[in-house]
């Protein structure tokens, strides 16, 4: 296997040279490596360091005693960066013999053999066998085949990436139903829909093991969804998390939407505002996507590090921190098209909407999205006035 060396953060590893003529990081390579996920990994380093410090505040243990599982490690770059740049013990697992060999090579290359362990196992088997303070799932595709084992294995924190955004966001409807046991909607806020369906699925998996969760940071970026969750042991905490599960009713005719908390509920097929048929999505997570204090902790970690995507990462985390804690965002252009007006500048529109007494924020999802507690009729009136 031909390889080349790459450096991310302060960590240098060997990664496979992709097949000739293949422009995008290919699944055909003997060991998968995606340079476009450097932002994801940079944030992971900062976020995992923030998680580790939270563990140390509550547990009488040393940094190196905290265990982190990179369940599908491939080249090992994510887990090795955690070991090298965070200083906690990383278990780097991959079922591929080629990947396992490369991980062993990279452990030697980075000089972290005292706090890095390579394993070559089925990820589900490993997670059923052992418990880890932090479990990181970053599979090629959907994380759903691994969530039962991961939610059992994670003691304090669970970090999950989903790259199957088409099923999550409703573009591949039946696939999304099968994988996530939820009805998605493929509309203007489909990216947030994907985040909340993923979180809803994780909450239900955790509940099977009498665990609850608190989302600390969740974002939809490029072709993937990523979330960082605090895991909370106890049946009562699992029950509490279930109170943040529910459904969305959305009218595409007038833009009215309603959320309904609970799993066994009755929802009208008709819009309570205009009477037209509505689309219903769920079950999905209706609680917070981000914890502002945790976002600040991640920002401090980013500031203290030399990272290739530092400014981009900081911008993303700031946007997440400052989002209103409301499901779901609105798309300004969709509403303008609905009422037949030109879209004004976002800053001017947000200022005008705030003058009505409404709370408003931009979001990290798109440049033309916003969240508000204003009613749809108020939003339309403001847009017509500009």
Swiss-Prot record:
Keyword set includes NAD: no
Binding site for Zn(2+): 251, 254, 271, 274
A Gene Ontology BP annotation from the UniProt entry: tRNA N2-guanine methylation
The keyword Methyltransferase belongs to this UniProt entry's keyword annotation: yes
UniProt cross-references to Pfam families, sorted A to Z: TRM (PF02005)
InterPro entries: SAM-dependent_MTases_sf, Trm1, TRM1_arc_bac, tRNA_met_Trm1_C
EC number, as in UniProt: 2.1.1.216
Reactions it catalyzes: guanosine(26) in tRNA + 2 S-adenosyl-L-methionine = N(2)-dimethylguanosine(26) in tRNA + 2 S-adenosyl-L-homocysteine + 2 H(+)
Keywords noted in UniProt: Metal-binding, Methyltransferase, RNA-binding, S-adenosyl-L-methionine, Transferase, tRNA processing, tRNA-binding, Zinc
An annotated Gene Ontology molecular function: tRNA binding
PANTHER family, per the entry: N 2 ,N 2 -DIMETHYLGUANOSINE TRNA METHYLTRANSFERASE, TRNA (GUANINE(26)-N(2))-DIMETHYLTRANSFERASE
Annotated family: Belongs to the class I-like SAM-binding methyltransferase superfamily. Trm1 family.
Protein function: Dimethylates a single guanine residue at position 26 of a number of tRNAs using S-adenosyl-L-methionine as donor of the methyl groups.
Name of this protein: tRNA (guanine(26)-N(2))-dimethyltransferase
């Amino acid at each position: 296997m031909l390889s080349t060396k790459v450096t991310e953060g302060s960590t240098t590893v060997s990664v496979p040279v992709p097949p000739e003529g293949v422009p995008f990081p290919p699944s055909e390579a003997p060991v998968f490596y995606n340079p476009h996920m450097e932002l994801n990994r940079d944030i992971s380093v900062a976020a995992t360091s923030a998680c580790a410090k939270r563990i140390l505040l509550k547990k009488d243990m040393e940094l190196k005693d905290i265990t982190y599982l990179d369940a599908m490690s491939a080249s090992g770059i994510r887990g090795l960066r955690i070991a090298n740049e965070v200083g906690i013990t990383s278990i780097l697992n991959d079922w591929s013999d080629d990947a396992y060999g490369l991980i062993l090579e990279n452990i030697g290359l980075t000089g972290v053999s005292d706090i890095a362990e390579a394993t070559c196992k089925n990820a589900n088997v490993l997670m059923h066998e052992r418990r880890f303070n932090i479990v990181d799932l970053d599979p090629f595709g959907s994380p759903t085949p691994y969530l039962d084992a991961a939610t059992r294995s994670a003691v304090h924190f669970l970090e999950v990436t989903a790259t199957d955004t088409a099923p999550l966001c409703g573009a591949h409807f039946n696939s999304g139903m099968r994988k996530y046991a939820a009805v998605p909607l493929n509309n203007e806020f489909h990216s947030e829909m994907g985040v909340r369906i993923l979180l809803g699925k994780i909450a239900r998996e955790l509940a099977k093991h009498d665990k609850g969760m608190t989302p600390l940071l969740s974002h939809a970026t490029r072709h993937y969804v990523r979330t960082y969750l605090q895991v909370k042991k106890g049946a009562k905490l699992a029950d509490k998390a279930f109170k943040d599960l529910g459904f969305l009713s959305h009218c595409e005719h007038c833009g009215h939407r309603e959320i309904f908390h609970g799993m066994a509920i009755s929802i009208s097929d008709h819009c309570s505002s205009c009477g037209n048929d509505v689309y219903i999505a769920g079950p999905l997570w209706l609680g917070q996507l981000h914890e502002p204090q945790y976002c600040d902790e991640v920002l401090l970690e980013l500031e203290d590090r030399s990272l290739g995507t530092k400014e981009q990462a900081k911008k993303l985390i700031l946007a997440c921190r400052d989002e209103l804690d409301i499901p779901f965002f609105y798309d300004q252009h969709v509403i303008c098209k609905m009422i037949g007006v030109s879209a004004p500048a976002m800053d001017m529109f947000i200022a005008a909407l705030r003058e009505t007494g409404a709370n408003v924020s931009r979001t990290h999802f798109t440049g033309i999205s916003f969240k508000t507690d204003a009613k749809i009729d108020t939003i339309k009136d403001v847009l017509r006035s500009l």
